[in-house]
Structures are given as C-alpha cells and as structure tokens.
C-alpha cells in the first residue's frame, strides 16, 4: 500500500470493516513510533550514548521492537512467513501496548538489554504455532518480562 492511500476515506472504511475499526489510526501510531525512534537514533549517533537522556534510547528501542517483531518476517520459516491476519492484529496491538508503556531504566545499557531480550522472546513467539501452548507460553513470558520493568 502506498503511504498516502491510508488517507483515502474509502481505504479507511474498507480497513475499518475488514480488519478493525480505527485500524488506520493504529497503523499511524506505529509509524510515528518508528519515526521518533529514527530521530532518537540520529541524536544518539551525533551525541553518543551518554550524551542523550535514557528516554532517547527507550524511544529508539521501541522503534526497533516494531521493526524486528512486526515489519520483519522470516521467509524461510513456514509459521512466520504465513501469518494470519488475526495473529498479526494481536501481535501488533501487543507491541503497540508495550511501546505505549513507560519504563524506568538505570542507564542506556539496561534499556538495550531489556529490549533485546524482549525482541528475542517475540521472535520465539513468531516461530510458534498460532494459539499453541508454546505460543501462549511466550505470550505469558513477555507479559511477565514487561511487567517487571514497567514503572
């Protein structure tokens, strides 16, 4: 889909009806997180890891979470390559929910470690059959992992 197509009322109506009401708003929310993450990364590259507040690192890693979990798929894995829309919706909303939370990190290294661990859990979840025990196990692990770090 071209980036401006989401602005067309007909596209919005179609997505509201066939995917979920206000789906376009959720897409824009994710897009904004990714854009803010790129901006934060630019500042980190200019000023250095210690030259910016931890919040910049958090913003960057939230965008990486969307990138690694939602935007990238493993075409060589049958499960990840063939992801039903219901699963995509659930995963996207789960990732957005995490991105909308506030966390308390001691420093940028703690932030980086947390998000790398989270991305790894989501990747394992992506390789698990939809609604299987393994899938649900990873979902619970992710929820626990996030709740331990939340403010």
Predicted segments, located by residue:
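Conserved catalytic/coupling modules of large nucleotide/cofactor-utilizing molecular machines
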Residues: 3-151
